[in-house]
């Protein structure tokens, strides 16, 4: 496994405030696994520091206001929650917001390789090691705003499994589906949906061949089950550049791309970053 954390990072660590004026924001859906977009100050002042559940939150400028783009974990309880906001002059306060309930559908899959459902002790050691690597990647922070918060599709194909599905493998309950699946022929290209820097590549027990991209301000995306990886940690990708090929490595029932988007260390629905006409295909 290769990871960007071993590389010198000074050349990309910017001390500048994220002052990008966004052309568009992602879709706001304040539910578990969704995104809350919350105005947190006027753009006449410098950007505030915003935190949620111990993680720093993306803040971007839209017109004359600063907005927090808050990732909401799938396990988050519905109800009242609060951001911690610290102004540029050091004054801290809390700002509450509401999270609505959402019931995700069930999905039952049959996996032919039983080890991918009930790993042996050696597999579990590997899984724990790989989980730690991915957790570190999802917590990565680069103080530079993304080029755009509306993503392109990372692969051409049909949506085969929606985000948030309550999954059962061989009738055994497992973690919910924390990504969006796009079914396509093996060997078809997978491209960066927005500008990003490769921070991790590797072959994982469940995820197969995997690439993780940092887009800035705590936004990280992940691409799983690739048949081939075409990038290395530190590679700077422009929107539309190929990072690998569709495959069926790891725990799969067929060739597809599993696409994950993480905000402030919370896995959120990637569809919320797609244009409305593409999101409509999921409804």
Question: Which residues fall in each region the model found?
Answer:
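Cationic-aromatic interfacial patches
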Residues: 23-96, 101-103
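Short, well-structured beta-strand-loop connectors
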Residues: 189-199, 228-246
């Amino acid at each position: 496994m290769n990871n960007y954390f071993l590389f010198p990072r000074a050349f990309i660590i910017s001390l500048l405030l994220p002052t990008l004026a966004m052309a568009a924001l992602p879709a706001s859906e304040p539910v578990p696994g969704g995104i809350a977009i919350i105005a947190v100050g006027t753009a006449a002042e410098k950007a505030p520091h915003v935190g949620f559940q111990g993680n720093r939150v993306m803040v971007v400028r839209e017109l004359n206001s600063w907005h927090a783009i808050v990732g909401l974990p799938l396990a988050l309880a519905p109800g009242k929650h609060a951001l911690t906001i610290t102004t540029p002059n050091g004054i801290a306060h809390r700002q509450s917001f509401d999270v609505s309930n959402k019931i995700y559908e069930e999905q039952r899959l049959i996996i032919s390789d039983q080890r991918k459902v009930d790993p042996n002790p050696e597999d579990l050691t590997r899984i724990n090691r790989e989980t730690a690597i991915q957790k570190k990647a999802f917590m990565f922070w680069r103080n530079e705003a993304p080029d755009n918060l509306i993503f392109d599709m990372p692969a051409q194909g049909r949506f085969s499994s929606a985000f948030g599905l309550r999954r059962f493998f061989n009738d055994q309950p497992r973690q919910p589906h924390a990504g969006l699946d796009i079914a396509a022929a093996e060997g078809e290209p997978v491209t960066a949906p927005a500008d990003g820097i490769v921070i991790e590549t590797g072959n994982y027990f469940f995820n197969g061949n995997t690439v993780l991209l940092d887009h800035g301000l705590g936004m990280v995306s992940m691409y799983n089950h690739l048949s081939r990886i075409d990038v290395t940690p530190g590679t700077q990708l422009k929107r539309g550049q190929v990072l690998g090929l569709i495959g069926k490595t790891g725990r799969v029932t067929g060739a597809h791309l599993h696409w994950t988007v993480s905000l402030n260390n919370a896995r959120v629905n990637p569809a919320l970053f797609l244009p409305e006409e593409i999101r409509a295909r999921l409804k």
